[in-house]
Amino acid sequence: MPLSYPHFRKLLLLDDEAGPLEEELPRLADEDLNRRVAADLNLQLPNVSIPWTHKVGNFTGLYSSTVPAFNPNWSTPSFPDIHLHQDLISKCEQFVGPLTKNELRRLKLVMPARFYPKVTKYFPMDKGIKPYYPEHAVNHYFKTRHYLHTLWKAGILYKRESTRSASFCGSPYSWEQELQHGSTSLNDTKRHGTESLCAQSSGILSRPSAGSAIQSKFQQSRLGLQHKQGQLANGKQGRSGRLRSRVHTPTRWPAGVEPSSTRCVNNLASRSASCFHQSAVREKANPSLSTSKRHTSTGNAVELNPVPPSSVGSQGKGSVLPCWWLQFRDTEPCSDYCLSHIINLLEDWGPCYEHGQHYIRTPRTPARVTGGVFLVDKNPHNTTESRLVVDFSQFSRGTTRVSWPKFAVPNLQSLTNLLSSNLSWLSLDVSAAFYHLPLHPAAMPHLLVGSSGLSRYVARLSSTSRIHDHQHGTLQNLHNSCTRNLYVSLLLLFQTLGRKLHLYSHPIILGFRKIPMGVGLSPFLLAQFTSAICSVVRRAFPHCLAFSYMDDLVLGAKSVQHLESLYTAVTNFLLSVGIHLNTSKTKRWGYSLHFMGYVIGSWGSLPQDHIVHKIKECFRKLPVNRPIDWKVCQRIVGLLGFAAPFTQCGYPALMPLYACITAKQAFVFSPTYKAFLCKQYMNLYPVARQRPGLCQVFADATPTGWGLAIGHQRMRGTFVAPLPIHTAELLAACFARSRSGATLIGTDNSVVLSRKYTSFPWLLGCAANWILRGTSFVYVPSALNPADDPSRGRLGLYRPLLRLPFQPTTGRTSLYADSPSVPSHLPDRVHFASPLHVAWRPP
């Protein structure tokens, strides 16, 4: 007869009418009983041939491809001028006095952040924008390019100008200047007799007014300015002021550098119309565009070969090809859907390329990408805005993967001990938190994103027009890309993007100037940064509480008025160091703080309502007697595991599911097991704050017996059969709790102390979790444990009770500014005879 739910509940001692604990509890450790119950509840892993279920409610499992939804009306979020001040440390010291070593160490980690992986794979530019939405390929291309352009304009990305130079917008940092003044740039050029630079003394090369002067030295490639490979680079001039023929000569002149003034004057003649086929109307209409000639360049049909500008020297050559976009202007329309109709809508399509306000030298940066990008909804609640997903997963894969640094995540009990109080709370929203932290320019070549331009992108998508190397720029294949879909998409995009369509149709390579979200280093750096800032705030306002996890900052104060003044002071401080807060998203919580998915009040912690609702939905849709794919089980366990500490039996109740996931097998929910879990999660108990106190109750055990010391009273008992030592110690702790009702128990067993009951026999783990719920444990060495003698059968000997105070831990929540001293690698005394591994012998 199958085990019914009431019987099962009785077996787990969850009912009040259970027999004496000392008799009932050891039975649950019996392996045979555990095996029979598991078989009865169908918890044995099924090796049946019934097809697995791959979807339960919203949880999808193996072989399922969730098709992401593309929104043609996505708006690109705006990024404020985020610039974390470089004198952050001195500003913090003005605010709070000298910083602690811990705070200094953390702040120095991000000023600037560094990222140098062992191996970086470079992918072709075609892989830059992922073809995530094949139905909306062109729309997705332009929206992604617009997002990247927005990030570049906000100073979050560098734009690769040539192999060894990049430009960016926004305020420069000193380390970006240092790259210019190193021994390899100015000092070398002087040593080799080359001309001095007409650059600003700051070392960052701001854009010169006579923009085109540089273009006699540099020719425009599909990715920006590069040196001409003609006579200038052949080295025959020696030291006569020309460039020397060294391997790295082209890097000596980053884009944006002007040669000496005479050269500048001579080269002014090379200025001409910005794009090959743009008419003179544009210069008359907008003279500023023609003066900043370096905004522009000519391209070619598929933009693969470097193409010189239409300068005086190159016009005579006759073989220069215009940019792919503007080339349509001089061709006959091939159909009603020819792109030339769109190109002829505007006389002035603007520049082919834009350049930043500042230039820096970079390490050698190939015209490749190291990760792909695509767009998704900003979050499940906001589908109107897009979010850029950057896939730098190459750094987390294979033998050369980077092992990311570990950092402390506060556990539930520590969080409750710290934040469960009668304070008033509010939480701050840091806008684009990751993009606050600057990255050293030397890391740029490892974090490259970009695109190969619209012509390549379209050619990849259409099967008819393949790009062959010998076909570059030939008019036969120019119109191959004219399709109805492309025409309609571009026409719609023209209404929102206007002449930027031209700019975005060119190829581009961008490297990260601030830390990107797709790299495992970023969460670590953000956590270090925000915890250091909170530490500074806590020391400045010792009567208040500031705490952070990643970009989630919370402030607590005794009263609402006090909290408001604290909020004003902290906001002003954060703004003064360059941290951007989204004040419209500040949330005032009253006395119940919503943080990290929990509601934390003076009564303790509970999961937030939306999580409880998800759990109810999950049980409603959970099928019984049907094999469920282990990947779905993984997702179910992820949800249930979050709320497990609030249930009677905790994590041990989920152990059968964990076992099936580990074995990668299907799992069948029996009606009894489902009813058991359902009941567990329908009644959630708060996790309470631990209180300090003095330990008066001690427990100890040997494999054959147990002993308790409750105040001055001693008790002992024996087990029917010898048990593993950890199981015996756990039973002794349960007896101590049930006999004394004490919430503070002293034990010498590290496994009981850890409160992880998942490695015990399943039924015992479930029951012990409920009995010991809300119990705090204090470690007492065996030699000093008053319960040691009773456990060995000696009741006559009385060891004096220890004064063993218990202080609740706030765990590794990085709360205190003073970091504990780091222990040396070897402890003072090494115990080789570990009690966990040495078989117990009777005294």
Curated annotation (Swiss-Prot):
Domain Reverse transcriptase: 357-600
Stretches for region Disordered: 228-259, 283-314
GO biological process: DNA replication; symbiont-mediated suppression of host innate immune response
UniProt keyword annotation of NAD present: no
Residues given in the record as Mg(2+) binding sites: 429, 551-552
Activity control mechanisms: Activated by host HSP70 and HSP40 in vitro to be able to bind the epsilon loop of the pgRNA. Because deletion of the RNase H region renders the protein partly chaperone-independent, the chaperones may be needed indirectly to relieve occlusion of the RNA-binding site by this domain. Inhibited by several reverse-transcriptase inhibitors: Lamivudine, Adefovir and Entecavir.
Enzyme Commission (EC) number: 2.7.7.7, 2.7.7.49, 3.1.26.4
UniProt KW Magnesium keyword: yes
Coiled-coil stretches: none
InterPro entries (UniProt xref): DNA/RNA_pol_sf, DNApol_viral_C, DNApol_viral_N, HBV_DPOL, Rev_trsase/Diguanyl_cyclase, RT_dom, Viral_Replic_Matur_Polypro
Residue stretches of biased makeup (Basic residues): 239-249
UniProt region (Polymerase/reverse transcriptase domain (RT)), positions on chain: 347-690
Any Pfam family hit: DNA_pol_viral_C
Catalyzed reactions per annotation: DNA(n) + a 2'-deoxyribonucleoside 5'-triphosphate = DNA(n+1) + diphosphate; Endonucleolytic cleavage to 5'-phosphomonoester
PROSITE patterns named among the record's database cross-references: RT_POL
Region (Spacer), start-end ranges: 178-346
Key words of the record: DNA replication, DNA-binding, DNA-directed DNA polymerase, Endonuclease, Host-virus interaction, Hydrolase, Inhibition of host innate immune response by virus, Inhibition of host RLR pathway by virus, Magnesium, Metal-binding, Multifunctional enzyme, Nuclease, Nucleotidyltransferase, RNA-directed DNA polymerase, Transferase, Viral immunoevasion
Entry text on domains: Terminal protein domain (TP) is hepadnavirus-specific. Spacer domain is highly variable and separates the TP and RT domains. Polymerase/reverse-transcriptase domain (RT) and ribonuclease H domain (RH) are similar to retrovirus reverse transcriptase/RNase H.
Family, per entry: Belongs to the hepadnaviridae P protein family.
Note: Hepadnaviral virions contain probably just one P protein molecule per particle.
Described function: Multifunctional enzyme that converts the viral RNA genome into dsDNA in viral cytoplasmic capsids. This enzyme displays a DNA polymerase activity that can copy either DNA or RNA templates, and a ribonuclease H (RNase H) activity that cleaves the RNA strand of RNA-DNA heteroduplexes in a partially processive 3'- to 5'-endonucleasic mode. Neo-synthesized pregenomic RNA (pgRNA) are encapsidated together with the P protein, and reverse-transcribed inside the nucleocapsid.
HAMAP family: HBV_DPOL (MF_04073)
Name of the protein described by the UniProt record: Protein P
Phylogenetic placement of the source organism: Viruses, Riboviria, Pararnavirae, Artverviricota, Revtraviricetes
